[in-house]
């Protein structure tokens, strides 16, 4: 198992817990809730995320699980994909039981805790796209209609259900980017990339002009003209300076910065830890992404490689959109920062996907060890043979 990836995950989870300990009570009191609401909730989310990561890490570990998966993989993935699509459609209808709507958007289910099915759709899209690429590569139909039709149908469903019905542009972009990067790495031609890019642009404009698009247009307008949210995010970075104001001294968390514990946690880290703290965090993400892509390069099986690349794209998209939105480089999308932000659904699902990468790194490192051992054996045998010839 890649120890560096494990250490980075532990560090990020610990930093997120520390930040929640520092600002959670202030945010809770500002909202009229008990001061330990968010800290206790985040501890519970981390516990569930660790379990999810362990499940992902041992998913294919046992021989019986591997054989069952190989035999029924296609049926399981298709059922999971279409079942998750149906669940997200259900979530989009406000009149149905358990559906939870906030600020005019129906994205959550109230099942004793708030759960966001679009996060589960990321896992479904990850497995579905990896299977589609691997299956079509094996059959020699990759890049043909047998590949493009189901892929574009899947992408269209994501745009309509998550982007239009649930009004969640952030998760829509993450899923489409993930599916696109997996297809690109698998061997898309430049012509196919151009066509796919054109379709994405057309779809984005259509999404902005479909139905109740006011809040999406406002996000784009605020990007060029400034906004309360964006301005206060920059103020948070300025307040932190080079070394930060320290734990417990955040001003932005007292109500000046919206969604301080989730969608705006990077400016809070910049305020508490300063420029150096924020840069250390970004360096940590760069190392994590590098180790993930290094794992993907060692995978011989196309489907396994696509799974790892998909997780790479998932984390990369979240980091770019969260950080880029907070520093004013791109429009805000309301996305979390992986392993740090408050949010049980997001944390659990990305932890499960990360666990899959850890599991795949076990096999690649085991293969590397076997290769090194056999190589040393061959070299030792050569030296011994030479010595015997000389004697």
Q: What residue spans do the PLM features occupy?
A:
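Alpha-helical transmembrane segments of multi-pass membrane proteins
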Residues: 12, 84-91, 130-131, 158, ...
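Hydrophobic, glycine- and aromatic-enriched re-entrant/interface helices and adjoining loop segments
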Residues: 102-108, 194-281, 299-307
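Membrane-helix boundary/helix-loop-helix interface segments in multi-pass membrane proteins
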Residues: 1-7, 18-21, 26-166, 323-338, ...
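Hydrophobic alpha-helical segments of polytopic membrane proteins
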Residues: 76, 81-82, 148-209
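Hydrophobic alpha-helical transmembrane segments
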Residues: 44-48, 122, 272-289
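Interfacial segments of multi-pass membrane proteins
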Residues: 173-192, 253-277, 334-351
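Alpha-helical transmembrane segments of multi-pass membrane proteins, especially transporters
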Residues: 37, 146, 150, 175, ...
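Loop-to-helix entry and N-terminal half of a specific, functionally important transmembrane alpha helix
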Residues: 297-334, 340
């Amino acid at each position: 198992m890649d120890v560096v990836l494990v250490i980075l995950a532990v560090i990020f989870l610990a930093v997120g817990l520390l930040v929640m300990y520092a600002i959670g009570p202030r945010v809770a009191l500002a909202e009229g809730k008990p001061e330990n609401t968010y800290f206790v909730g985040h501890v519970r989310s981390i516990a569930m995320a660790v379990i999810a990561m362990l499940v992902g890490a041992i998913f294919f570990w046992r021989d019986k699980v591997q054989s069952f998966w190989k035999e029924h993989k296609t049926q399981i993935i298709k059922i999971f994909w279409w079942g998750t699509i149906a669940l997200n459609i259900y979530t989009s209808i406000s009149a149905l039981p358990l559906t939870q709507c906030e600020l005019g958007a129906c994205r959550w289910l109230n099942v004793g805790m708030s759960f966001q099915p679009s996060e589960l759709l990321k896992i479904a899209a990850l497995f579905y796209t990896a299977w589609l690429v691997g299956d079509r590569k094996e059959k020699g139909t990759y890049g043909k209609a047998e590949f493009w039709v189901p892929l574009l149908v899947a992408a269209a469903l994501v745009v309509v259900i998550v982007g239009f019905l649930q009004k969640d542009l952030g998760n829509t972009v993450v899923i489409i980017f993930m599916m696109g990067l997996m297809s690109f790495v698998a061997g898309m031609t430049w012509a196919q990339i151009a066509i796919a890019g054109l379709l994405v642009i057309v779809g984005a404009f259509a999404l902005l002009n479909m139905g109740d698009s006011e809040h999406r247009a406002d996000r784009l307008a605020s990007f060029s003209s400034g906004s309360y949210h964006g301005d206060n995010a920059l103020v948070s970075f300025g307040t932190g300076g080079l070394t930060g104001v320290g734990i417990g001294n955040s001003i932005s968390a007292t109500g000046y910065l919206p969604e301080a514990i989730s969608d705006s946690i990077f400016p809070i880290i910049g305020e508490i830890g300063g420029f150096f703290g924020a840069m250390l965090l970004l360096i940590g993400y760069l190392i994590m992404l590098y180790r993930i892509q290094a794992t993907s390069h060692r995978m011989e099986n196309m489907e396994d490689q696509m799974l790892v690349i998909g997780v790479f794209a998932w984390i990369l998209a979240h980091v770019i959109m969260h950080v880029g939105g907070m520093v004013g480089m791109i429009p805000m999308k309301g996305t979390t920062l992986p392993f740090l932000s408050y949010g049980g659904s997001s944390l659990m699902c990305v932890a499960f996907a990360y666990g899959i990468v850890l599991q795949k790194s076990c096999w690649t490192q085991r293969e590397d060890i076997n290769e090194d051992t056999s190589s040393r054996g061959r070299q030792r045998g050569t030296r011994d043979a030479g010595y015997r010839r000389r004697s």
